[in-house]
Structures are given as C-alpha cells and as structure tokens.
Amino acid sequence: YMVANWLINGDGSVFLQDGNTTALSSGRLSDVLIYLKQAFPQITRITSYGRAQNLAKVSPEEFAELKAAGLDRIHSGFESGSDEVLKLINKGVTAAEEITAGKNVKAGGIEFSVYFMPGVGGRALTEENARGMSDVINEINPDFIRIRTAAIKPQTGLYEDYLNGDFILCSEDDKVREIRSIIERAEGIETRLVSDHITNLLQTVEGSLKTD
C-alpha cells in the first residue's frame, strides 16, 4: 500500500530510513541505489541517514561513486561539535571525526545536512555546545544545519544525572542563545539553518548563514 501511495502521490523523493545506511560498503549501497532507480525511474532524489563515525571512514572517491549511483543527500545527527558534550552524551564520535565525515561527503559531491541539539550539554556546557558546533560547521560548510532541541528521556544516563542534580537543564533562553551563537559565529559559510521541528521553541525559522 505504501509503495502504491508513493507511486500515485509521491514527489519522486526516496529516503533510506531507519538507521545508518552508509554502514554498508559503498559497492553494496551503490547496487541498492542503482536498483532503486531502475525499478522506479520516476525517482528524482534519494536521501539517507549516516552516522559520522561511519562516514569518516568513507573516502571522497567512494562518496562520488554513491553520488553517481543516485545518492543526493546525507543527513547526520551530530547533536554537538564539542568533544566534552559528545562524551557526556556517549555519542561515540569526536569533533575531528565529524569534520572528516563532512568534508568527505562534500568532496564526493553529495549534499550534507547535520543536526544540532541546543541544550544537550546542559547549563554547564551551553556555551561550549554552541562554540563546538560552530567550529565544526565552519570547517565543513554543510548545506544544512537542522535544529533538534534536546529532550532528556527517562531511563537514560543523562536523565539519571538530571534526577541526581548532576545535570541542570538549559532554559529556553539558553537554547535560543545557542542558536544565536551559531549564527553569529558563522564565518562566510553558505549553510542554511533550518528550525522546523515540533520540539523546537522556534519552529519556523530558516535562512542562509551567509546572506540572511
């Protein structure tokens, strides 16, 4: 039913969902992309998620191969660009790996969209969270930085820290200041900032960090 609905009402876009598609070898993923475009010639764009830790291991040449096979954009949940914050949330990646990942994707000709979580470092690391992310995107110049405000979930280590008083939540003002810091620290990059999610205080903000 979902495929039939897409064929009738879809706009030609395909999203390879549910995790870390780019964990596949570039050869296997290329085969999938080529098959998709052969089976559904009306496809106009293919997008995928990708974890920075995996993306950093893929060469620009391999990304160029994926681009030629039909992959147009990769979304990656960086959450932060601060090593201190990344360690706090057990992200399993470093800022250096994020930068390598982004540069490799861009060098391969694929659009790159990263996600930033205002508030994920708590009040103690709110400035560090914004500063670290700014440093990372200034190095990469991703096509998009998408805002996904942190929500601390029960049954997680960070939630336990919150209950114990070891993690103090950011205020809404803190989170907006983090976004403002990202905008102010942009160094001539052409990245578009997009805040369009229901968890965000600012739900309809979008613009170029260079021209708007």
Task: State what each model feature region is.
Residues 73, 96-158, 172-196:
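Conserved C-terminal portion of the radical SAM core fold
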Residues 58-59, 87, 124-127, 157-160, ...:
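Short, well-ordered secondary-structure micro-motifs
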Residues 87-92, 162-168:
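Short glycine-enriched, charge-decorated loop/helix-capping segments at active-site entrances
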